[in-house]
């Protein structure tokens, strides 16, 4: 459980990095900016790796789609060139804030 706290903090750190990477840009800019894409995909993969390490007990306590979060890591690492960047953008804009909120609530 002690490590779970660290994993959750690291996930929050990665979310913060992604938010800084995409601050002030829209989807069209993201889809045409390979440097930002690479940085974001790396952080999403890291979030997925950390999600795999969180204990089942903690996963039960935090109601987020852990399996899907971990699954993105597998796609990012094994099928990097098959990643749908539109879906990645949707993940950034729709899913990261609720994930951050859930983790922050758990850590309090």
Predicted regions and their residues:
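Solvent-exposed interaction patches of small proteins and small membrane subunits
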Residues: 1-108
């Amino acid at each position: 459980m002690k490590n779970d706290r660290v994993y959750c903090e690291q996930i929050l750190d990665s979310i913060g990095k992604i938010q800084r990477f995409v601050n002030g840009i829209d989807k069209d800019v993201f889809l045409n900016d390979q440097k930002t894409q690479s940085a974001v995909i790396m952080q999403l993969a890291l979030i997925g790796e950390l999600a795999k390490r969180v204990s089942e007990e903690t996963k039960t306590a935090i109601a987020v789609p852990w399996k899907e979060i971990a699954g993105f890591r597998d796609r990012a690492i094994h099928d990097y060139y098959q990643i749908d960047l539109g879906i990645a953008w949707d993940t950034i804009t729709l899913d990261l804030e609720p994930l951050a909120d859930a983790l922050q609530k758990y850590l309090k």
